[in-house]
A protein has these predicted regions:
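Macrodomain-like recognition of ADP-ribose-binding/processing modules
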Residues: 1-133
Length: 133
């Protein structure tokens, strides 16, 4: 219902939402897709985009109406576990996924946002990101 109301039924790659779930130990679920439909996302920055979206939601986000929460997400979420983003159907090698998640953590949590002086530098950084180097 939340995705229909907030995103016309489709949560794009690079966006994240949080909803309450009924589980004795896990109170919240964050949806941060790595692909629009089941397909290969190897050679893309999709794991980075999904991880960054989830981390930004926890750090800066607010609960949406109908999510089961209210106020700042950071007041409710104290830890975050992520699966191997894109490593199943998406075919992203686990090492590449881990490297992309690391860059997302560096940017969002540690504040090491990469600024590029020109397009060439941005393309080189993107190439390193998708290769996991």
């Amino acid at each position: 219902a939340l995705l229909r109301a907030q995103h016309d039924g489709e949560l794009p790659v690079g966006r994240a939402e949080i909803i309450a779930i009924e589980h004795p130990r896990i109170r919240w679920l964050i949806a941060a897709p790595t692909m629009r439909v089941p397909m290969s996302v190897a050679g893309t920055a999709h794991p980075f985009l999904a991880a960054r979206a989830a981390l930004r939601l926890v750090k800066q986000g607010h609960f949406a109406p109908g999510s089961g929460g209210e106020g700042h997400v950071s007041h409710a979420v104290t830890s975050l576990a992520m699966p191997g983003l894109g490593t199943g159907t998406g075919g992203v090698p686990p090492r590449v996924c881990a490297a992309q998640v690391r860059v997302a953590i560096e940017e969002v949590i540690l504040g090491r946002v990469h600024r590029f002086p020109d397009l060439r530098a941005a393309l080189a950084a993107h190439d390193c990101l998708v290769r996991g180097t």
